[in-house]
Amino acid sequence: MVTSNQLGFARLLMQLCVKNVQSFFLALLRWLSMQVSGAHVQQTPARKISRPESRTSKQKEGSRAPFTTPSSVNYHFTRQCNYKCGFCFHTAKTSFVLPIEEAKRGLRLLKEAGMEKINFSGGEPFVHQKGSFLGELVLYCKQELQLPSVSIVSNGSLIRESWFQKYGDYLDILAISCDSFIEETNQLIGRAQGRKSHLDNLHKVRNWCREYKVAFKINSVINTYNVEEDMTEQITALNPVRWKVFQCLLIEGENAGENSLREAEKFVISDQQFQDFLERHQSIQCLVPESNQKMRDSYLILDEYMRFLDCREGRKDPSKSILDVGVEEAIKFSGFDEKMFLMRGGKYVWSKADMKLEW
């Protein structure tokens, strides 16, 4: 007859057996799982994704780059313009302009990050609020931020003497775009409004710059319509502090390709044609040449949303706005080549107080 003690001992022995069997099978399952995982990793190596380099992949690469000081920044705060230049590479794709307090906040962020020079451009910067918005930004940058240099690029057609009277003291450099000293050529290019004389505006603004002590500069885009022109006599007479000579540039989505507002292919010249133009004008000491490569890599460009634009791939890939992520994060994706910036003479005497000009 089995006693109660014997039954209890048998029950305990059975429980121990069951636990040992469970432990054995759990260990076996873990071992098998590890073997299967290891085999899977060996059989399935990490895939290399083969696709064209995208903005996202470039941003990952950019995130490892050291911080770039934004010493000179070009702020295209509006895309609107009253001219229709056929090769324009910053076209009127939006009508957006930041509220002025937001624009000022972004400019302060840039100053805190090391900005010394701000250049306002467009579009045509005098279009918005008839130049008063631009004037207040110029005033803010010189008075409040105390930037060494504040400059503007304009076509000159909308500038009035009253603007110089109010804001001229705070502006260091005014660059006027002029591609030809032949009126018919300017009309063909689109550097005109109706039948008004672009050259008359150029000379008028030049005289105001002398009167109100603003350094005068000329920007010219060399293209199929003006590449054979000799501008030596006219540039010498106008005597700008700098004559920037650009090779006509194609930018996908702006003046070339699908969804572009311009078709600039017919304006494009070869590198040799550009070099011939430069050699024809080599006697002009203030000439600063800019080939396509220099233009793509050596400018810090902010769009109307205060996003840096990376033009290295022949298109404009935007960063996030400095208003959202700050300058240090956004500038990683600007595509900016500081060495090229210095090679093209990007850093020069850019404060009118240091230019020792004869007004």
UniProtKB/Swiss-Prot annotation:
Cofactor binding description: Binds 1 [4Fe-4S] cluster. The cluster is coordinated with 3 cysteines and an exchangeable S-adenosyl-L-methionine.
- Which sites bind [4Fe-4S] cluster? C81, C85, C88
- UniProt-annotated stretches for the region Disordered: 43-67
**Topology in the lipid bilayer:** Peripheral membrane protein
Keyword hit for ATP-binding = no
Q: Name one GO biological process term.
A: innate immune response
Required cofactor(s):
[4Fe-4S] cluster
Q: What is its main location?
A: endoplasmic reticulum
Briefly describe its induction: By interferon type I, type II and LPS. Induced by infection with spring viremia of carp virus, presumably through type I interferon pathway.
Instruction: Name all Radical SAM core domain ranges.
Output: 67-287
Which terms are listed as keywords in the entry? 4Fe-4S, Antiviral defense, Endoplasmic reticulum, Immunity, Innate immunity, Iron, Iron-sulfur, Membrane, Metal-binding, S-adenosyl-L-methionine
GO cellular component terms, alphabetically, are: endoplasmic reticulum; endoplasmic reticulum membrane; lipid droplet; mitochondrion
Pfam families xref list: Fer4_12, Radical_SAM
Cell compartments where the protein resides: Endoplasmic reticulum membrane
Report a single Gene Ontology molecular function: catalytic activity
Q: Where are the transmembrane segments?
A: none
Basic and acidic residues: bias regions: 50-63
Query: Cross-referenced SUPFAM superfamilies, in alphabetical order?
Result: Radical SAM enzymes
Q: Which NCBIfam families match?
A: viperin (TIGR04278), viperin_w_prok (NF038283)
Family statement: Belongs to the radical SAM superfamily. RSAD2 family.
Q: What's its job?
A: Interferon-inducible iron-sulfur (4FE-4S) cluster-binding antiviral protein which plays a major role in the cell antiviral state induced by type I and type II interferon.
Q: What is this protein called?
A: S-adenosylmethionine-dependent nucleotide dehydratase RSAD2
Protein's organism: Danio rerio (Zebrafish)
